[in-house]
Amino acid sequence: MQSTVQWLENVAFEAKSESGHTVVMDGSPAYGGENRGARPMELILMGLGGCASFDIVTILKKSRQDITDVICQLQAERAESIPAVFTKIHLHFVVKGHGIKEKQVAKAVELSAEKYCSASKMLTDGGVEITHDFELIELSV
C-alpha cells in the first residue's frame, strides 16, 4: 500500500491514495490552518470507524441479517501532553434493519474488535483502550 502527501500551503496537505482518491487535511486556525479539511488525527479516528464498520456489515450480511444501515459513532480521548496520542476510543454501533438478531450483532462486534479490524489491532497494540457497544433499531415493514 502506498500514499503520497503533498503540502498545499500553510498547514494544509493533500493526500492521494494508491487507489486514486484524494483527501485534504488542514490544521486548526490556532495552528495556522483554514479549516479546509479534516485534521490528521480525525482521519485516524474515521479510519478506525470505517474499518470496524466494514467488518460489521460484512459479517452481518454473511449471517443473513436484513440490515439497512450501520452507523459507527466514535468518541476519543487524547493525552494532554505531546504527542497527544489517543488514549481511549469508544465505538458505538447503531444497526438498523428487519428481524436482526442481537446475538449476531454482538458476535460481529466481537469478531471485528478481536480478530478482523486492522486499525483497532494497531491502536490497541499501541496502548489505546478501545471499547465497543451497539444498539439495534427494528424498522417496520
How would you label these PLM feature ranges?
Residues 54:
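Short glycine/serine/threonine-rich phosphate/pyrophosphate-binding segments
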